[in-house]
């Protein structure tokens, strides 16, 4: 009798895992799997920790973007002020030239008058 018991293989090894039905009953479709929502697989503490980490990274990214934008705005303002100063200088230079020309013209007219009076 002991020999008969030894020859039989254990029942647990031969039984394979039960698979779900084919989708739509067709061979080429995948097997159905058990519906297991992802929400219950991770713990609440782990999810809150992930949210905090994500919020921290987003805050850091926002801060870096703001710094970058302020630097860009500062450069733009510097360029604008330089351009405005250059335009102002050019305007004054043109005005000085005009004023000088007018003064020279006035002096020439005076000289002509004086010549006419003397002659």
Curated annotation (Swiss-Prot):
> What does the UniProt entry say about where the protein is found?
Nucleus, Nucleolus
Where are the coiled-coil regions? 47-105
| Any GO CC annotation of this UniProt entry | nucleolus
Biased-composition ranges, Basic and acidic residues, are: 82-99
UniProt GO BP: rRNA processing
Which UniProt keywords are listed? Coiled coil, Nucleus, Ribosome biogenesis, rRNA processing
- Has UniProt tagged this entry with the keyword Transport? no
Family the UniProt entry places it in: Belongs to the CGR1 family.
Task of the protein:
Involved in nucleolar integrity and required for processing of the pre-rRNA for the 60S ribosome subunit.
- Quote the protein name from its UniProt record: rRNA-processing protein CGR1
Which species is this record about?
A: Phaeosphaeria nodorum (strain SN15 / ATCC MYA-4574 / FGSC 10173) (Glume blotch fungus)
């Amino acid at each position: 009798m002991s020999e008969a018991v030894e020859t039989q293989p254990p029942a647990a090894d031969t039984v394979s895992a039960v698979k779900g039905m084919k989708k739509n009953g067709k061979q080429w479709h995948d097997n159905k799997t058990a519906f297991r929502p992802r929400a219950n697989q991770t713990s609440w503490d782990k999810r809150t920790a992930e949210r905090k980490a994500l919020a921290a990274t987003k805050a850091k990214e926002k801060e870096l973007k703001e710094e970058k934008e302020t630097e860009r705005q500062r450069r733009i303002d510097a360029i604008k002020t330089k351009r405005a100063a250059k335009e102002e200088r050019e305007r004054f230079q043109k005005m000085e030239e005009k004023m000088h020309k007018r003064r020279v013209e006035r002096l020439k007219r005076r000289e002509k008058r004086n010549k006419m009076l003397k002659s």
